[in-house]
């Protein structure tokens, strides 16, 4: 990286979200897909995967009655990372506006973060910026019902 070549500090924070896929309200996911102009046909197809999902719990030999699941993305589904990213995109856009002068400048581009599924890497040139970025990310995520897994934060 350029920062290493010119011997300038670079601060990274690895962020993991707590139970992120499990808490996505499906009604809000459909609204987010509509907000980003995903076609109605695609939204209907995705809704079909989530239509009336239910579970039962077995304890010993006893099986519970079925109960319906109204939130959460499917674990292991190839669509889940993309659906999750779409769900939190508005929060990330608001966060990036607040942190617009921070991050790592490479040529004409500023990189604030890298996101893969529910794992997030924050990038800053100094510790104070990283702290500011982290506080604002926590605030934005909380508005969407998401929490950082503090036990898995790594600087």
Region annotations inferred by a language model:
Residues 1-155:
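Nucleotidyl polymerases of mobile genetic elements and RNA viruses
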């Amino acid at each position: 990286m350029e920062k290493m070549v010119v011997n300038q500090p670079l601060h990274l924070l690895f962020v993991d979200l707590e139970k992120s896929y499990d808490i996505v309200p499906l009604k809000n996911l459909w609204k987010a897909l509509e907000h980003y102009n995903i076609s109605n046909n695609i939204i209907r197809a995705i809704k079909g995967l989530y239509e009336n999902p239910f579970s039962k719990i077995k304890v010993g030999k006893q099986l519970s009655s079925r109960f319906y699941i109204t939130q959460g993305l499917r674990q292991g589904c190839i669509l889940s990372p993309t659906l999750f990213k779409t769900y939190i995109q508005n929060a990330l856009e608001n966060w990036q506006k607040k942190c617009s002068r921070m991050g790592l400048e490479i040529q004409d581009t500023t990189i604030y973060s890298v996101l893969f599924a529910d794992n997030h890497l924050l990038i800053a040139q100094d510790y104070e910026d990283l702290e500011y970025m982290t506080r604002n990310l926590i605030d934005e995520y909380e508005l969407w019902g998401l929490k950082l897994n503090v036990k898995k934060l790594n600087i």
